[in-house]
Amino acid sequence: MSRIGRMPIKIPPDVKITIEGNTVRVEGPKGRLEREIPANTKLVVENGRAVIEKAGEEKPGTAMLGLTRTLVANMVDGVTKGFQRNLELTGVGYRASLQGRKLVMTLGYSHPVEYEPPADIEIEVPAVTRIIIRGADKEKVGRVAAKIRSFRSPEPYKGKGVRYEGEKIRLKAGKAGLKKR
């Protein structure tokens, strides 16, 4: 049995978990999340703890224990604390702003790039070169951050573009050593 799958998930008092068939619903102060868990695993909630168990004795159930436990633990963390991803814009004239809920970015194209986030994702722009993405669903926060980064990925020569906070970009040397004839 998986070591991660064996660990119980601590459930805070303000979080409510309901199970209907293979659907797990987690409700808390930051929202409500719902996810299907594999049919060969089951979730048991007791005394403020949740434990993932195999539904049968077949091997696929064992293989999914750690994944299922981590997904449910992320749901519990999401509805209590939430998740956040920070992005930085690097480059001359690269800037971001909010127009209502819509994120508008100037990324060196001939037109501004506009992005409308999903309803349960919150975007904040504290400075023109910083974007903060928050939400209860870890997967969705990461997907939105990756989508925004894909509008102008950091290029390898000067590092200009949208990058995750703290991301290191390996720069290439360029054509500096070229001889003239």
Swiss-Prot record:
One of its GO terms (cellular component) is cytosolic large ribosomal subunit. InterPro entries: Ribosomal_uL6-like, Ribosomal_uL6-like_a/b-dom_sf, Ribosomal_uL6_a/b-dom, Ribosomal_uL6_bac-type, Ribosomal_uL6_CS. GO terms for biological process: cytoplasmic translation. Keywords: Ribonucleoprotein, Ribosomal protein, RNA-binding, rRNA-binding. One of its GO terms (molecular function) is rRNA binding. It holds the Pfam family Ribosomal_L6. Belongs to the universal ribosomal protein uL6 family. Part of the 50S ribosomal subunit. This protein binds to the 23S rRNA, and is important in its secondary structure. It is located near the subunit interface in the base of the L7/L12 stalk, and near the tRNA binding site of the peptidyltransferase center. This is Large ribosomal subunit protein uL6. It comes from Desulforudis audaxviator (strain MP104C). The gene is rplF.
